[in-house]
């Protein structure tokens, strides 16, 4: 197990990045377990490592959402914890904190959800959200924060509390 302490001056750690919605996050349980990336910057850290990091320290989650080259939204959560594989990497997120132009709380419905992929369906939907929308995530029924959804699978990156349109880029960061 990786034990870590969170210093006040820690550097944010990239958990996930979807550069433009054309990269497929429709990956297997085994791939999400260890993580993956490509040369353009699309990235998933890996669920095992997320569990190891967050199990030993108190971390926060920062979601950076880019609508256009000049329009960004930031959503912060005061707790981010990922359970072990035996719990299906159950997600715990704390209270939402947004800025003056915050995007709103789209992660709340994902709190307490198990991770789902096309080959391991743990969501609350009668279907398979990861398979339907083209990406593994802590789906509920199905998502409010569609951080791994491909543009050709419907909405593209979505943060449902934003009033209109899709996002160009979505990034999740582990912060202190």
Regions picked out by a protein language model, each given a short descriptive name:
Residues 1-176:
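Mature extracellular or lumenal effector domains of secreted proteins
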């Amino acid at each position: 197990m990786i034990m870590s302490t969170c210093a006040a001056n820690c550097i944010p750690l990239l958990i996930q990045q979807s550069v433009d919605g054309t990269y497929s996050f429709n990956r297997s349980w085994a791939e999400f377990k260890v993580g993956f990336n490509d040369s353009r910057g699309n990235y998933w850290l890996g669920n095992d490592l997320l569990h190891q990091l967050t199990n030993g320290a108190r971390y926060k989650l920062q979601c950076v959402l880019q609508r256009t080259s000049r329009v960004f939204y930031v959503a912060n959560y005061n707790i981010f914890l990922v359970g072990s594989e035996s719990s299906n990497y159950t997600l715990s997120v704390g209270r939402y904190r947004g800025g003056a132009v915050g995007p709103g709380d789209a992660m709340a419905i994902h709190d307490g959800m198990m991770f789902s992929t096309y080959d391991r369906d743990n969501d609350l939907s009668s279907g398979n959200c990861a398979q339907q929308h083209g990406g593994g995530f802590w789906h509920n029924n199905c998502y409010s924060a569609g951080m791994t959804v491909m543009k050709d699978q419907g909405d593209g990156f979505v943060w449902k509390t934003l009033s209109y349109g899709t996002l160009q880029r979505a990034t999740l960061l582990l912060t202190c």
